[in-house]
Amino acid sequence: MADPEVCCFITKILCAHGGRMALDALLQEIALSEPQLCEVLQVAGPDRFVVLETGGEAGITRSVVATTRARVCRRKYCQRPCDNLHLCKLNLLGRCNYSQSERNLCKYSHEVLSEENFKVLKNHELSGLNKEELAVLLLQSDPFFMPEICKSYKGEGRQQICNQQPPCSRLHICDHFTRGNCRFPNCLRSHNLMDRKVLAIMREHGLNPDVVQNIQDICNSKHMQKNPPGPRAPSSHRRNMAYRARSKSRDRFFQGSQEFLASASASAERSCTPSPDQISHRASLEDAPVDDLTRKFTYLGSQDRARPPSGSSKATDLGGTSQAGTSQRFLENGSQEDLLHGNPGSTYLASNSTSAPNWKSLTSWTNDQGARRKTVFSPTLPAARSSLGSLQTPEAVTTRKGTGLLSSDYRIINGKSGTQDIQPGPLFNNNADGVATDITSTRSLNYKSTSSGHREISSPRIQDAGPASRDVQATGRIADDADPRVALVNDSLSDVTSTTSSRVDDHDSEEICLDHLCKGCPLNGSCSKVHFHLPYRWQMLIGKTWTDFEHMETIEKGYCNPGIHLCSVGSYTINFRVMSCDSFPIRRLSTPSSVTKPANSVFTTKWIWYWKNESGTWIQYGEEKDKRKNSNVDSSYLESLYQSCPRGVVPFQAGSRNYELSFQGMIQTNIASKTQKDVIRRPTFVPQWYVQQMKRGPDHQPAKTSSVSLTATFRPQEDFCFLSSKKYKLSEIHHLHPEYVRVSEHFKASMKNFKIEKIKKIENSELLDKFTWKKSQMKEEGKLLFYATSRAYVESICSNNFDSFLHETHENKYGKGIYFAKDAIYSHKNCPYDAKNVVMFVAQVLVGKFTEGNITYTSPPPQFDSCVDTRSNPSVFVIFQKDQVYPQYVIEYTEDKACVIS
């Protein structure tokens, strides 16, 4: 028997991270070795921990999902002895209509951790969980928390009584499957909780795709225990395979996980069925010989297509590149059509649970397939398809057919507000700067859904490897040279393709080299990263070659605007949502996210997060709009969480309202009203002139004309340096004024050998309002702290506050934030700029509750507001949210050298 305290602690950690973690990430949170942890998980069994494996040619990644046998009693009034929890499930999730003062009106108990409930939790070894952690665990373990299942639903392909108008709002899935007691290995009812319609209903009831994914994996595990795989019965004793509709990880289309991937030969012996979305009006798989299906399984192993991230628990889809698989294509009615010859549905490898100490490596099912892969796929594809494996919405297809977009002009098209003309130019760049971008290798690529509405390429890694891989965005799988569309494009664009384009089978990193951008890479030709003259790079896949676009700055400018998702380039249309140029995949290479690098890193990508209001306007998080209270989270905070947990859900507040933001679904949900808003993540635009200026040195003043043209066209640049709209007032204080005396004395306390030239007061009502609101929330007085920086940043700071992306110091050992000093001399000595061009800001800073910092921190630990160098008598304060800071004064000073008599 596993140690109850250890199991409870592991469950607590998992629930604090959304109910699921990669095994490697879990090992970092506990003081156990890997063999010890594996033994605990095995002894505890799948009723406590479901262990999943995602495998590929690069290796195996294991994930752990928390579950429990504890259940909530469904009776309104339970008078008899009961081993279940008695509580209000809506209150547990923070959604009960009765407030705390009205809890007596609710039919269910609001005492989550009552004495009776505590006994039940103790019996299930869960007494150490708090309310929030218990909510996570029960939500993915107890089917009582799921929406109602339709009682009229009889299964796919059978006569259904359910014909409600409007369509049924209940779940059409197997009720027994959710309870873990379905006795049919080939059940006629659907076991696919990741079906589009099911997900939509789940979302309406507050269950985001992350939670549904965990429920799917837990139910799959129970079903495998109930129906262990064995020798297949004769066909006469099996149900018609055409109507099977279960989802055992391999049947997931948008995400999924594979539990202990088996070999192809073993998998071929098990039933391999399509999901409910695929099987209507199709021939039975019984018609296809087993040997033929087995051969097709082996052919699908190592094609030039994507596989799910090895760091996640998503399904290894052997059918193609998208999470839906290239063996399917979505038609306008939402159905899917197979691209396999003689196969009426997609085929997936089956998998079995094995004991933790005996986790086995992948069987080599990917060998000897390259020469035969063309026999699996149809030689022709519909023109409406964006690429082989890149699915395209009917909206995108219809839009491209519109004659208004197929102009010779280069223009950016805003979906609702018309078009914005931009200078025309050739489609591709002949003279791209930098070495060839060898973005993919002979192994398959990894794809995952992104917050930008498309997919990203990521290299095989443990749970949360380098963030740069998340910023390389692309769709579609690698097209074969024999694709007839490639020849068509090559005929028309052969004279403009780049000579430095990269082959898809080259080996290289997806990350643009920061050293090359800043001061020159010391590794030169041996550097594994991409060398390019901009922190972003746009390319299009033609055949097996990634070709650079010309005028990348113009494409980037459109992409950075959250309201723009289509732009036309000559006779071609770029769709930022699906990352395609007509029927060809495109991608955006990028530098790493700014929150993952030290504060003094230059040219990292700063991502901005937006939500869409009722009028269709994209609002930046943390920004006040239409006199509404701004949210208590901003882009830097969200980006930090996204980089550490890209499948997570973030709770936050805006005024008195509570919300949840799902990274995977990119949806913001009002917890009370259940209304949802779209969310998007786009980078801050960095013009080429700024890159050149930073290479020359940050003290060089930029051309003022550039900022006018940029801010007039693109709203996302409000946080970008030098793009100020003069929304502040800077006034010099007279040297006899008491305010001048107070500030100067504070400055000279540590700067005795320096002379003050001027002290100017900053007045910015917008920044002051945000600071005042934050101050009222934290209920504390601010400290007067110092921050030395380049004179070139005065306008940016006065207008938009401090920014760790641009206004950096050499330090980062206490966290990746903004460094303020108690003594001015400390900030002066740590300023990385020429002393002749340095100014000193005096800021009001809300340090709040602080703890000792760490170089890995991108935000303060929970329950803390800032980080310091030492807790006893701190002299350095690291702030991660700029609303905790208000720049109040700026001091111009020079060194007062002593007179020397010779």
Curated annotation (Swiss-Prot):
Short sequence motif named Nuclear export signal, residue ranges: 285-292
Keywords attached to this entry: Acetylation, Antiviral defense, Cytoplasm, Immunity, Innate immunity, Metal-binding, Nucleus, Phosphoprotein, Repeat, RNA-binding, Zinc, Zinc-finger
Induction of its expression: By type I interferon (IFN) and viruses. Isoform 2 is up-regulated by 3'-PPP-RNA.
Residues annotated as domain PARP catalytic: 716-902
Residues bearing the modification N-acetylalanine: A2
Region (N-terminal domain): 2-254
Location of the motif Nuclear localization signal: 69-76
GO biological process entries: defense response to virus; innate immune response; negative regulation of viral genome replication; positive regulation of canonical NF-kappaB signal transduction; positive regulation of interferon-alpha production; positive regulation of interferon-beta production; positive regulation of mRNA catabolic process; positive regulation of RIG-I signaling pathway
Modification note: Phosphorylation at Ser-275 is essential for sequential phosphorylation of Ser-271, Ser-267, Ser-263 and Ser-257 by GSK3-beta. Phosphorylation by GSK3-beta enhances its antiviral activity.
A Gene Ontology molecular function term of the record: cadherin binding
Span of zinc fingers (C3H1-type): 73-86, 88-110, 150-172, 169-193
PANTHER family cross-referenced by the UniProt entry: POLY [ADP-RIBOSE] POLYMERASE, ZINC FINGER CCCH-TYPE ANTIVIRAL PROTEIN 1
Protein family per UniProt: Belongs to the ARTD/PARP family.
Domain text: The N-terminal domain is sufficient to bind to viral RNAs and promote their degradation. The second and fourth zinc fingers are involved in binding to specific viral RNAs. Contains a divergent PARP homology ADP-ribosyltransferase domain which lacks the structural requirements for NAD[+] binding. It is therefore inactive.
Protein name, entry field: Zinc finger CCCH-type antiviral protein 1
Source species: Homo sapiens (Human)
